[in-house]
Regions:
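ATP/adenylate-binding site constellation spanning eukaryotic-like Ser/Thr protein kinases
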Residues: 37
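A beta-strand edge to alpha-helix "cap/lid" segment located at domain peripheries
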Residues: 2-33, 41-125
Length: 125
């Protein structure tokens, strides 16, 4: 694997952790909007398909407010120099409640050099 691909892999892992820090915060939408491509799509369990404009409504019930989370079995696919997908298993807790799901996020890098979410999906296990 070329060294640039290794750097892209590491960048995407850092971005995914930034995403999950935002997802588990008290007010996710502002940071999620910043991280997202304008046409990004979000697929959460038991929620309608969400776009950037509907993030505030999707998070109104605080369904994703976890105290802790851990990403396991992280795999990165570098699509090209400006795009990649990361998949993993997520384990999160809220009080005594456990949340276990698989996750996948596709990231694209804009002309400004910033990574933006193109799509994000979680599937309950």
């Amino acid at each position: 694997m070329p060294p640039i691909y290794e750097r892209i892999e590491q960048d995407l892992i850092v971005q995914e952790r930034t995403l999950w820090t935002a997802l588990t915060s008290a007010d996710p939408p502002p940071e999620l909007e910043r991280l997202s491509h304008p046409d990004a799509i979000w697929l959460f369990p038991k929620k309608d398909i969400t776009d950037v404009e509907s993030l505030p409504q999707t998070f109104a019930d605080k369904f994703h407010h976890f105290e802790s989370y851990d990403l396991e079995d992280v795999r990165v696919i570098v699509i090209d120099l400006m795009a990649g997908t990361i998949t993993y298993r997520i384990r999160a807790t809220h009080g005594k409640k456990q949340y276990v799901a698989t996750g996948a996020t596709t990231w694209g890098q804009g002309s400004d050099g910033e990574w933006r979410i193109i799509s994000h999906q979680q599937t309950l296990q």
